[in-house]
From Swiss-Prot:
Family designation: Belongs to the UPF0260 family.
InterPro entries per the UniProt record, alphabetical: Puta_zinc/iron-chelating_dom (IPR005358), UCP006173 (IPR008228)
Family annotation (Pfam families): CxxCxxCC (PF03692)
Lineage: Bacteria, Pseudomonadati, Pseudomonadota, Gammaproteobacteria, Vibrionales
UniProt cross-references to NCBIfam families, sorted A to Z: PRK05170.1-5, PRK05170.2-1, PRK05170.2-5
Protein name: UPF0260 protein VV1_2014
Organism (species): Vibrio vulnificus (strain CMCP6)
């Protein structure tokens, strides 16, 4: 049995298809984060981009997400050093820090339902940016991700 690509290749060596398959579809990267200007500490909120579908945990306009969502960032292999803002459970961040994929990851389980069952997605746990006045009121204390 061959070694899975995420264990045998660096992030830079992955094909576009392999790179895209690392995304577990949890939707956490679509939540707004706040950064302390003095310490650069990242604070996660439960405030979602208006383009995020909170039931499917995916973008409502995925093909056009980088032009539709003004704050949508494309994760690319040349930005690996910047992945510190991603959730600790994110495959891109974990592999960039030489950590294994979590046991519920779809590449390991073969389905996304294990991720949802483990409580690792944003499914039905968010508010939308259009409904929020003060994002600091929505900081998640001790996020599980």
């Amino acid at each position: 049995m061959s070694t899975p690509f995420w264990q045998s290749k660096t992030l830079q060596e992955m094909t576009e298809q392999e790179w895209e398959s690392l995304c577990d579809g949890c939707g956490k990267c679509c939540l707004h984060k706040l950064m302390d200007e003095e310490t650069d500490e990242v604070f996660y909120t439960n405030v979602a981009c208006s383009w995020l579908n909170s039931k499917t945990c995916s973008c409502k306009d995925y093909p056009n997400r980088f032009s539709s969502g003004e704050n949508c960032l494309k994760l690319t292999q040349d930005k690996i050093a910047e992945f510190h803002w991603l959730p600790r459970t994110c495959a891109y961040r974990r592999l960039s820090e030489n950590q294994p994929l979590p046991e519920w990851h779809p590449l390991i389980t073969g389905c996304k339902s294990a991720m949802h069952a483990a409580g690792q997605s944003i499914r039905n746990r968010v508010v939308y940016e259009i409904d929020v006045k003060d994002w600091e009121d929505h900081v998640i204390e001790n996020p599980d991700y």
